[in-house]
Regions:
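Short beta-strand/loop motif that positions the catalytic acidic residue
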Residues: 182, 188-190
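Alpha/beta-hydrolase active-site loop
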Residues: 75, 108-130
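N-terminal cap/lid segment of alpha/beta-hydrolase-fold proteins
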Residues: 28-55
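Primarily recognizes the serine-hydrolase "nucleophile elbow" in alpha/beta-hydrolase
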Residues: 122-183
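The serine-hydrolase catalytic nucleophile loop
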Residues: 69-81, 200
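Short beta-strand element of the alpha/beta-hydrolase
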Residues: 60-68
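Catalytic histidine neighborhood in serine/cysteine hydrolases
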Residues: 208-225
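Conserved alpha/beta-hydrolase
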Residues: 83-104
Length: 254
């Protein structure tokens, strides 16, 4: 779906951050973690993050799920269970400073949105060390922006999916220098009525990125992982399933 002409670059204003964060729900811890394993891993700057592994330990394809704010990894648990049932090894984790509780413990450090790419890089490297040879990144809101930044310049990320990722948030920015260096297959998903303007950002990401890529603007007001539980949830989940099956989990993966 096309959009009107994109306005100029988004200003780095506190109001932009507050509007974006207020549009994100806190995420529910009610989702089952049956069959998953709590783990932790360090970042390059020495912060230990809390996470959880879902899916078969011998899977050759994996997925890292990066959460939106002010939610935590529990917002991804339903999708993690769904992907695990499809045969993927899935890692959810909490960005530094986030603590949903439970047997997984808390991520260390102070909350810092600008450290999201550092945290996600550590999560990606951890999952690859766990066994999967092909690992995709899926991020909601700021997790999506971080996913684009982490995938840029790396040849070991065959697929990236963003749900309502902003182009700019505080000091994080996914501009042309980032987007043109992502070799993996990119799927940008956003709701047309998202009050944070995610549809405009998704169109921008699509316009600036090389192939393979796809833009999906759905008729919804939901933001981030809320797209998976909203009126377009089944459609969004199917988009993710097909993208991963096409670019991450080919029969010849080994």
């Amino acid at each position: 779906m096309g959009l009107p002409n994109r306005p100029g670059p988004l200003p780095l204003l506190a109001v932009t951050v507050s509007v974006l964060l207020s549009s994100c729900s806190a995420g529910s811890s009610a989702a089952s973690t049956s069959g998953s394993t709590p783990i932790s891993f360090p970042t390059s700057d020495g912060v230990r993050l809390s996470g959880r592994l879902f899916g078969p330990a011998d899977a050759v394809a994996g997925v890292v799920l990066a959460h939106m704010l002010p939610a935590d990894q529990t917002s991804w648990f339903p999708e993690a269970a769904h992907l695990a049932a499809a045969g993927y090894r899935v890692l959810t984790f909490d960005l530094r400073g986030y603590c949903p509780g439970g047997d997984g413990g808390c991520s260390e450090g102070q909350k810092d949105v600008n450290a999201a790419p550092t945290d996600l890089t550590a999560a990606l490297d951890f999952l690859r060390s766990d066994g999967p040879t092909r690992v995709a990144l899926i991020g909601a809101s700021v997790g999506g922006t971080a996913a684009l930044m982490v995938a840029s310049g790396r040849q070991d990320v065959p697929a990236v999916i963003t749900l309502s990722a902003p182009e700019v948030l505080d000091r994080l920015a996914a501009g042309p220098d980032i987007l043109t260096n992502i070799s993996g297959a990119k799927l940008f998903i956003a709701g047309l009525g998202d009050p944070a303007g995610a549809a405009t950002s998704a169109q921008y990401f699509y316009d600036q990125s090389p192939q393979p890529k796809r833009l999906e603007i759905v008729t919804a007001d939901d933001h981030g992982t809320d797209l998976l539980s909203g009126s377009q949830g089944s459609h969004v989940e199917q988009l993710i399933d097909v993208w991963l099956a096409t670019y991450l989990h080919p029969a010849e993966a080994s």
